[in-house]
């Protein structure tokens, strides 16, 4: 699938899914979809894998669990890199609200397929991420995140990648 077709599909999914689900159900929409893009392998010393990536993430507000350590919820998502690498994941995130600002750390094990991109040493990879979100409208946020993906030395090699 070409990157232009993927971007179009991603935009249509992001904009039509909430409208379609709200028209079918009078209940509150408890599903949160995040669409994101960034730079894949930002600290690429060999200059062979740095590229863009585009992804989508889902969480359900009904599954938030309040604890003394914060508000936790499961997340599921995936991204496609500009070199046809994919990462599909599911894991947990915490959310700490500071007024209109949210700090959201997460940990998500997942499946990585390199495509024409960087070899990470194993199909099983772990993503740790810190995200800062700012509420800009009633149902919209804008944010910045930084993530690291590696296999914890369980693979043949473990170069890891950093994304922002």
Name each region found by the language model.
Residues 32-43, 69-81, 104-113, 146-150:
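Transmembrane beta-strand segments that form the barrel wall of outer-membrane beta-barrel proteins
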Residues 20-30, 61-72, 97-103, 139:
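Short loop/turn motifs that connect adjacent beta-strands in outer-membrane beta-barrel proteins
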Residues 24-29, 44, 135-164:
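Predominantly the C-terminal beta-signal and adjacent terminal strand-loop region
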Residues 52-56, 72, 86-92, 126-130, ...:
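Hydrophobic, lipid-facing positions within transmembrane beta-strands of outer-membrane proteins
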Residues 42-52, 78-89, 117-123, 154-161:
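Solvent-exposed loop/turn segments connecting transmembrane beta-strands
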Residues 20-64, 78-80, 163:
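Short glycine/proline- and aromatic-enriched beta-strand/turn motifs that initiate or cap beta-hairpins
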Residues 1-28:
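Cleavable N-terminal export/targeting peptides
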Residues 54-60, 90-96, 107-109, 130-136:
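Residues on the lipid-exposed face of transmembrane beta-strands in outer-membrane beta-barrel proteins
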């Amino acid at each position: 699938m070409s990157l232009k077709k993927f971007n179009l599909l991603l935009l249509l999914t992001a904009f039509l899914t909430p409208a379609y689900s709200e028209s079918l159900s009078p209940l509150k929409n408890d599903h949160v979809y995040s669409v994101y893009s960034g730079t894949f392998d930002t600290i690429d010393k060999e200059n062979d894998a740095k590229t863009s990536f585009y992804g989508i993430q889902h969480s359900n507000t009904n599954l938030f669990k309040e604890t003394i350590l914060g508000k936790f919820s499961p997340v599921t998502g995936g991204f496609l890199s500009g070199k046809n690498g994919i990462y599909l994941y599911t894991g947990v995130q915490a959310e700490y609200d500071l007024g209109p600002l949210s700090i959201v750390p997460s940990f998500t094990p997942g499946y990585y397929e390199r495509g024409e991109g960087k070899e990470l040493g194993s199909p099983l990879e772990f993503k740790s991420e810190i995200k800062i979100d700012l509420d800009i409208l009633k149902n919209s946020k804008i944010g910045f995140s930084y993530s690291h993906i590696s296999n914890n030395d369980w693979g043949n090699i473990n170069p890891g990648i950093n994304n922002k």
